[in-house]
Each structure stands twice: as C-alpha cells, then as structure tokens.
Amino acid sequence: MDESNDKENEFGDSFLEDSGDITRTTEDEDEAPLEPRFKYERLEGESTLPFMKTATFTSIDLHDKFIAIGTASGLIYILDHHGYGNFDSVPPLKPHRCAVSKLKFDETGSYILSCANDSKLVVSGIGNDKLCCTVNIQVMPKSICFSPDFIRQQSGHCFIMGERNLVLYEKRLFQYKASNLYSGSERDGFIHCCSWNDNLIAFTNDTGTRVYERGTEKILTSVQPTHDVDRVRSSRCPPKHMWMSENTLVIGWADTVTVLKIKGNEGMRKGEIHHIFHVSMFISGISYLPKNGSDYELFLVGLQMEGEDFDDCASVMSTMTTLTAMESSATATLKTCVIRPLGLKDYELQSEDEIVNIRLSTHTLPYMIHGLGIPYLSTYFILTTKQIIMAVPYGPEDGIKWRLQYKLYTEAFEMAKEHADMLAKTDVSPKKVGRKIIEGYLESKKARVAASWLSSICGDCKEEWEWAVDRFHDAKMSTLLGDVLPDSKPRLDPSAYEKVLLASLFNNVKLFRRLVQTWSPDLYMTSTIIDQTQWRIQQISKSEDIEDVEEVEKILMDALAHLYLYERKYESALKILMICQDFQIFNVIDKHQLFDLVKDQISDLMNINSERALRLLLDNADSVEPSFVMAKINGQPKLQLAYLTKLMSRNEGIEFADKAVQLYADHEKKKLLPFLKKNVNYNVTKARKLCSDRGFVEETIFLLAKSGNHYEAVKMMVREYKNIEKVIAYCKDQNDRDLWIHLLEVVADFPTHFSQLIIEASNCLDPILIMDKLPDDVDIPNLSEALEKLLTDFTNYVELQQCCYDSTLNDLHVLTNNLMLASDKSVSVSLMTRCSLCSQVIMNTGQDMIPRKFNDIKVFKCGHIFHLTCSASEIDRRQMIEDGICIACSDNSDHVNV
C-alpha cells in the first residue's frame, strides 16, 4: 500500500483546488484601476550633481533643449533633459540673493528671465549676453514672461511682470521702459501667473483671468474663479496657464480646469469657455498630450489633501502657515492624472497615478510643486523642493508589466504579441509573458483557465509545451492537459505524453481511456503504460476505498485492450474485450482480420451483439461452415433463426430450409408466410403438416395451394375464413372452371354466401350450370336479386357478343370491297416509266430503233413495273414473278422482317 500511495501522490491531480472558470473573460474579481499612462523616474544625472542632494528647489522652466532650476539660495542651474549639467560651459547663474520664485526661457532658449523677492528682474544669457540686463523695481514680482519674439531685432525685447499691476518692459537705448497694461487694486490681489502667446497676454489675479490683446490694447475677456479665493489663497495655490494651438488657453487654478478659446479676427476677438470642470486635487502643473485632429488630453499634476482634522482643503490653503502645517494631521499626496474633456462640465478620466516614491514634507503645499511638459516630445517633469521627477510615457514593456500585476492577462499577452520584435530580448517577450500567465493562474488555483491558454501561448513551440507539461506536473494538474496537448506540430517527447497518461490513470480513468483510444501509440512507450495499467487494475481490485470498482475496472480493461492492440497482442486484447462484452470487438476483428481467433466463441459474440455477429459470420463464410455455426448455437434457437435469415437472404444455406420453417413457426410466426412464399427449398409436405398441426390457417392454405390441392384449399378457406370474398379472389387468380364448380358445391352448405357467389361466378360459368347447383329446400337470402343480376349480366354478355360479331362482318365487307377496287384499278405506263429493278425507261427503243414488245414487261397491281430481262439471272425472283409476287414488295417485306 505504501507504493500505491507514492504513485497516487506522484500523479494525483487536485481537482477541488481548481475553481477557475474555463473562459478567459474573468481575469480577476477585483476591478483593475485605470492603466497608468506614465512611469516616474529620477533624472539619470542626479547622482552626478552634488547640489541635487543639498539644494532646495523653488522654480523650474523647460525648453526643448534645457531645464532651468531655481533654488532657495538664488542660484539657477542649467541641465539637459536627463539631469546632466556641463558647468564648465554653462556655469550656474547667481542672479538673486534669495530664493528664485519664477523662471522663464525665451522661445530660442538663449535667455532666462528670473525674479525673486529681492525686487529684481534679471535677464540672463546662456552662451549669449547681448540682451542680459537687471531691472530693479520697487515691488516683489509674482509672475514674469518673455514676449514670443523677445530675441528678434526691433521687437523691443519685451517682457512682462505681474504684481498688483501688469507691467510691460520694453528695451530702449540705455534702459528698459515700463508701461502699465493693467492696474489692479488691493482687493484684486496679486497677479500670480501670466503668459504670452502671439499678441495675447493672459494674467490671473484673485478676481479672475483676463486676456489682453496687444495692438488694440484692450482686455478681450475675463474668466471669474469658481472657487472661494478667500479660502484658497493664490499665494498657496497659484494658478497655472498653458497655451495650446488656435489660441486656446487652459487655466488650472485650485481644483478647477478651464479651457478658454479666443475666436475672431484681430480687433474683434472674444473669448469662449469650452470646458470648465473640477478635479479631486489642487493643481500644481498642467500640460497636454496631443492627439489626432482637434482631440487632446490634459496632463495634470497636483496635491490631494487628506487628514482626520482636515475638513476643508480650501481653509487649510488660506490659514496654514509653516508652523500650523507641521502640527496638522492633514497629509498631502502627489498625484497626476490624464483627463479627456467631453462636454462643458464633463470629462473622462484616462489615468490617475499616486506618486509614492516622492519624499514630501508634512507642510507641502501646491505652490511648492511644479509640473511642466513638452508635449510634442512626450516629456513631462515634476519638481518638488528636493527632487526632479521625469514622467515618461508608458512603453509596451511597462504596459505589459502593469497588466500582469493586475492579472489582465489577455491584454498583456496581446500587447506582447503586438510588439514581439521589440520585446524579444526583454523579460516581457511573448514567451516569458505566456509563462507568467500560466504561473499566475496556477498560483491562483485556476488551472483549467491556465490549460485553456496553452494553445495560444505555446503555439508550435515544442520547448514551451514541454515546459508547460512539467509545470502542470509539478502542480499536480496534468490531467487538464489531456484535451489541449498537441499530437503533431509540434510532437513532444514521449515523457510528456506519459506524464499526462499516468496522471489520468490514477485520477480520471475515463480520460485515460479516451486518450489511449485517440492518441497515436507512437507518441509514448506503450509497454510502460501497459505495465502501469496492469498494476493499477490489480491495486483497484484489492482496494475497498474506491467507489464503483467494477465500472473503473471495466474502463481500465477497455483501455488495456487498446494498448494490447497497439502492441499487436491480439489474443490478449480479444480476451479482455470479450470479458467486458465490448461492442468494439467487432471493429477490432474486422480491422485486423481476427475471425479465426474467435470463431469458436460465436455464441459469446452473439450475446454481445447478434446483428454484428451475424454480419461477421456472413462476411467470413469461407472460413466457417454454416453447419459448424448452427452446431455452436444449437441451444439458442433465436440466434439460429437470425443466422439463417441472414444466410438465406444471400441465397445460401438451402439445406437448412426445413429448419428455418420450424424456427419461424416457433419464434417468428409473422415471418413464416413470407418465407414460405419466397423460399422454394423446403419440403412442402412437412411444412404443411407442421402448419396444420399448429393451426396456422393462412400458411396451411398457401401450402395446400402450392402442392396443387386447390379443392382442399378452397374448402378450408370457406370453412375457416367464413368470408367468401377471399375465396372468390382466390378462384379468380386460379381461373379454373372446375374450381368454381367445386366452390359452388362447397358454398351450398353456407346459404348466406351463395347469392354473392352467384354474382361473382356468373362471368366464369354458364348460368344454367349455376342454376343446377342451387340447393333444394334451402332458404338463400337475396336469391331473387342475385338471379336477376345473373340473367341480366348474361343477357348483356350475349348482346355484346352478337354486336361484336356483326361489327366484324361489317368490317370484313368493307375491307373486301376496298381490295376489289384496288385490284380492278389500271396501272399507267408511259414513255418515262422506269423499271423498279434497273431504273431504265420501260418503253425505250433499242439501237435498231425498234420498240420493245409489251410482253417484255411485267406490271403488278401494286404499281411496280419490271423488265423480264432484268431478273433473268435471278431464278428465284423469276419464279416469284411467274407466281405473281412483286420482287420490290418482297424486298421491302424482307427488310422490315429483318
């Protein structure tokens, strides 16, 4: 028993653990979050720059080539997009003595405009110092921006600065000239954000966002804030601007996103709000993801404020100081999201990420976070006080990993196949992703689903199929491979098929039998499977723990028989099939021509299926005599009858005709009469005696008639049937006058039938004879009507006969007259009449110009004319002419006869 337990543990499959659905649609019970659109990485050059570890970052701006970072110490560092800086060529700038609050590149990336609380506006050059300058002002600037054409000659080299007023600085000969574009009051608050696109300048203070048009020098439109600016102070949560194509301005302020579009020609422009909606965070940066056509998506960076004593994020923004923030339990979470605007106030959230690997202090507020992007480069940056994070769009490798993490296996595998060439050498190639999917389902106890994936994942790869077999074997789920394992293209090593067979042998015997029957024996070592099957059968027969032992043994015996057939051990296979009473034994005998091995077991074959056994016997009639078969099944008359029926349907076994009559009489009476009518090889006398003794009326009557004893047949029919119609029909078929007379004599004892017989026999007998046969002193029902009909029919018959005679005479007279007229008709003979034999003219003259005599021709009433000389050489035909027979008509008659 220890060996038994070991084998069961080796090949056993735990079906109870497999609760997975066979379909692939149910990937995970938990709904997966939105798929990220970005991954977040530190800059590569961060580790090479010492200042990155110590500096506090306060501002940032982007250009296609550079990143400019302002620090709390007043320094500005110029780095590339990967965080590397060449400080020998572009050393750090020191334009301010305090924290740099704002930075701005010009469009060419040649200059940087910066400001700080030291009341300075500084234009610094990057490899160019022609336009560098420092403007001292009386206020602390809150926002700055270059004009789009700052570097162009004769453009004025303008830039703007926002505090309470919006001031335009234009370069003159020796200094910058300041011009107020907008003057704000104290209640209007500070201008915390300004931007310049073409000739449109947008700026935002506490009263809203305005768009100023240069040239007309007027404000085109104003967008009011939708939040309470007294509670959400702009100093804590400053607004953000982003210009898009077609003069579209996106404003991110507090938790609101507004999309404003400037329409119309210069001088008649106006603003239209296309979208305005709220998001679940305080916005710190805004950019966009370009799409085809006019479609686009917005990329937002912000803080989500949470905490037990955090009632209203807005109130925190207005009242929180550094000290109160440190004491508050409100926590800030850095988040990004991608949204697609739909309607005026509706949007669709495409992705939402919480950046958990960022170190945020407990007093972090939205103004401390900056988010910028270069959309056409798909490059986005997030700046905190201590870190610079690059948001890189998800590639196929990242997308696959995320899908695998959330068990979105179908999507992961489809993406891996779509980018197979790109991912071939990575850890998310289609091959490796497929393995991870299988592993994931097996670990989740969903082995059936894993098995359903194998065809798609493994395909024609032999290595992958064999890996899957080993993996399922380790998980004790090998039986699930029975329906999916390929038997060709690819063909696996025999050990793979043997693992599945042995697992099913010990856990699912029905599957084992089916696999043995359907798989080619060339796929595995049949001798190994035979040994294990024999051992398993012995084990089952001794076990008391297995339910339905007999059924399990029968299934395994059936499978073992097929294995013996593969090994060409036909006697062993037939022995098992015979014991199991398996219908397939007949197919085996036919296929392998094994009749000689079972001809001594005909009776057993009959018990399995008599129809197939009989067919088998008849197909092998040359190998076994009918007498041998009849002797083998002597004690089974029904089988004998079935055998003889099949045998005689092939016109064989005539020596058993009398035996067949007896068997039909004993077991199939309904088929006896058809057999008697069809077969002619039985002894009629014996058959009649048998039927008579058994009281078979119809059969006895038939045999009496067949032996020629019609009188007895008629007499028995009248006596037994008591139905004169069948007797009359029989007499009509025989058409014997004496039989009718005999019938009249027999029916005389049955007066009720006599009237009907008189009517039917009137066409076959003389009425006078019928009248003579009428019984005396017997009351015959309906006799007068029958006699009346008899005489009427006879009278009609005589009249019809006379009419036919008269008609014949008239026809003869007419035909005779026509013949006489034809005989008396003359035949015209002219100079152009030709001989019917030689086709020469009858009356032609000879060379001596002497006409032929008329006795030289012969004319017949049929119209044919001959020269007597034309038939001189034909003695028989001459004799015909002399006898008055036309040669031409005789020839036509011969052709017709032929």
Swiss-Prot record:
SUPFAM superfamilies named among the record's database cross-references: WD40 repeat-like
Entry's Gene Ontology molecular function annotations: zinc ion binding
UniProt keywords, alphabetically: Apoptosis, Cytoplasmic vesicle, Endosome, Golgi apparatus, Lysosome, Membrane, Metal-binding, Protein transport, Transport, Zinc, Zinc-finger
Keyword Protein transport: yes
One GO term describing the cellular component: late endosome
Zinc finger intervals, RING-type: 835-890
Main location: membrane
Region span, Disordered: 1-35
Subcellular location per the Swiss-Prot or TrEMBL entry: Endosome membrane; Late endosome; Lysosome; Golgi apparatus, trans-Golgi network
Composition skew (Basic and acidic residues), residue ranges: 1-10
CHCR repeats: 614-756
Classification via InterPro entries: Clathrin_H-chain/VPS_repeat (IPR000547), TPR-like_helical_dom_sf (IPR011990), VPS41 (IPR016902), Vps41/Vps8 (IPR045111), WD40/YVTN_repeat-like_dom_sf (IPR015943), WD40_repeat_dom_sf (IPR036322), Znf_RING (IPR001841)
Similarity remark: Belongs to the VPS41 family.
Subunit annotation: Probable component of the homotypic fusion and vacuole protein sorting (HOPS) complex consisting of the core class C Vps proteins vps-11, vps-16, vps-18, and which further associates with vps-33.1, vps-39 and vps-41.
UniProt xrefs under PANTHER family: VACUOLAR PROTEIN SORTING VPS41, VACUOLAR PROTEIN SORTING-ASSOCIATED PROTEIN 41 HOMOLOG
Functional description taken from the UniProt entry: Plays a role in vesicle-mediated protein trafficking to lysosomal compartments including the endocytic membrane transport pathways. Believed to act in part as a core component of the putative HOPS endosomal tethering complex which is proposed to be involved in the rab-5-to-rab-7 endosome conversion probably implicating sand-1, and via binding SNAREs and SNARE complexes to mediate tethering and docking events during SNARE-mediated membrane fusion.
Protein name: Vacuolar protein sorting-associated protein 41 homolog
